Amino acid sequence: MAACVDKWPPAAYLCRLPEKFYCVLPDCTATDRPVVTASAAPAPAASGSSGDYVWDVLRAEAQDDADDEPLLRKFYHDLVLSRPSLESALASLLAAKLCIPGALPQDQLRDLLAGALAAHPEAGRAARADLVAARDRDPACAKMVHCFLYYKGFLALQAHRAAHALWSDNRRAPALLLQSRASEVFGVDIHPGARIGCGILLDHATGVVIGETAVVGYDVSILHGVTLGGTGKESGDRHPKVGDGVLIGAGASVLGNVHIGDGAKIGAGAVVLRDVADGTTAVGNPAKPIIGKKAAPQRRPEELPGVTMEQRWSD
């Protein structure tokens, strides 16, 4: 797997996007890493642009929906159209979802989330890359604003990014609070210590579990019911390390401090207990590489399984 994933420090994100989409990630420094083309992403409107590609598109889509559906006008106004930035909108939306009336006030939770996102701008850049990934990979995602408002996999991942920011600042109690609430509300349990890259799609997301010392690379797609867990016998660094461009099928379990190589595919229902090499398809319980295949050719980034979502395990 990519060495940069193994050495990746907490709360540090370097997002991969083609040059024309660098404005997706304000203040993001370009790297020499390969880039993934977000072919399905619409071009931003020329007028009224804020210079933030994703936020401009999100607001335009929200306005279109509000114009078409009067019932949704206040909803879209309160959560998107009245907000000055994607980070502000995200903090407000997550606070509305995760608050506990009478015990965890929405306004105080919003301030906590907004503070975490402001202190860690890399989390906002990652959220933008996640939105582009969902729009590009999920044929059911007609608009990025639908992913932003309605897709619990996206929302759970952004709650994790805020929790990870707090965890990295040694604010463990509020980080664990966000983890707990996200698990209760979204059915997705990601430990705030887990390190997760950009351009991630949690598709459907119900039942996804990611442990404390897990690392997930860039451009990874994970379906529902996936566990990146420990074996229950170790402490310390005990969770999987997932490379770039990996696709993990529904119901798969990857257990222990094993490495899943770049561009690998893990079949639905597989139980992975050993390392999986780059470009390899592993299926079964216990998971084994598919026999009789030639070594996978070096793929361009846009051809990696995590980007294409190609789920034919025998190719």
Curated annotation (Swiss-Prot):
Enzyme class: transferase
Region (Disordered): 287-315
Coiled coil (residue ranges): none
GO MF annotation terms: serine O-acetyltransferase activity
Pathway(s) it belongs to: Amino-acid biosynthesis; L-cysteine biosynthesis; L-cysteine from L-serine: step 1/2
PANTHER family for this protein: SERINE ACETYLTRANSFERASE
One protein family per Pfam: SATase_N
Keyword entries, A-Z: Acyltransferase, Amino-acid biosynthesis, Transferase
Gene Ontology CC terms: cytosol
Complex and partners: Homomultimer.
Example GO biological process: cysteine biosynthetic process from serine
Catalyzed reactions: L-serine + acetyl-CoA = O-acetyl-L-serine + CoA
Name by which UniProt lists this protein: Probable serine acetyltransferase 4
Classification lineage: Eukaryota, Viridiplantae, Streptophyta, Embryophyta, Tracheophyta
EC number assigned by the record: 2.3.1.30
Family: Belongs to the transferase hexapeptide repeat family.
NCBIfam families from the UniProt entry: cysE, EPS_EpsC
